[in-house]
């Protein structure tokens, strides 16, 4: 995106003053175009695949959109800005709800348009999350920037009250770096925002995948050095 050197320098300085730490140059972080973090759902009733994703709209400004496809290859993207980044969507009481980073909830009647902003839960340094609904409870797998080591945690939310009264439970660690390929032998250091360079003692980016009723979790290991698969038993 186009931005003057003076405006970019001012934006970088504001981020630094706020205490933001990133793993690379902040100017790069604020201006690098990208499409990322797909959240994909198979809509059997309407024979379509729905994908939520985010990208860079302008300097320092990212947001999410939604696209749909009949074959999983060719997608038609909507133009509406539906919310913050790293959206994870779920169905509840005939509506589509979404959890974005950091802890911001939205909902929509059709899952494509007019997303209403709701409560914000969790903590400001929440990173990415993965969600699944079981018996009126939302299970949220998530990680927290700054933890040493960053690990995958689980919190639950009772969905029965009005969403303005939702509250997350205290987190429980479900996965931490314990194997060599998970970064177990790297130094224990607090994690930072953005890309993880090299072999670090961190687990990140949980994503849930359901097949034949079995729930699996994919997650990033040793920072972002690989992807592992675990089975989730409820």
Which sequence ranges carry the predicted segments?
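Beta-rich carbohydrate-recognition and catalytic domains
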Residues: 1-201, 210-234
């Amino acid at each position: 995106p186009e931005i003057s050197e003076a405006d970019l320098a001012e934006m970088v300085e504001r981020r630094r003053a706020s205490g933001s730490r990133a793993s690379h140059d902040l100017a790069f972080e604020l201006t690098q175009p990208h499409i990322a973090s797909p959240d994909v759902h198979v809509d059997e009733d309407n024979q379509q695949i729905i994908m939520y994703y985010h990208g860079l709209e302008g300097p320092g400004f990212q947001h999410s959109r939604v696209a749909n496809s009949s074959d999983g290859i060719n997608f038609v993207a909507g133009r509406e800005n539906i919310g913050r980044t790293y959206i994870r969507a779920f169905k509840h009481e005939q509506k589509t709800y979404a959890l974005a980073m950091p802890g911001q909830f939205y909902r929509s009647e059709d899952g494509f348009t007019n997303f209403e902003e709701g409560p914000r839960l969790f903590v400001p340094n929440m990173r990415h999350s993965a969600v699944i609904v079981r018996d009126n409870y939302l299970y949220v797998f998530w990680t927290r920037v700054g933890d040493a080591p960053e690990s995958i945690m689980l919190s639950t939310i009772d969905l029965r009250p009005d969403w303005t009264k939702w509250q997350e439970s205290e987190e429980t660690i479900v996965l931490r770096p314990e194997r060599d390929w998970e970064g177990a032998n790297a130094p224990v250091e607090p994690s930072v925002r953005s890309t993880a360079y090299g072999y670090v003692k961190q687990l990140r980016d949980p994503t849930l995948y359901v097949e034949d009723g079995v729930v699996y979790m994919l997650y990033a290991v040793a920072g972002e050095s690989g992807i592992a698969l675990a089975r989730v038993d409820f």
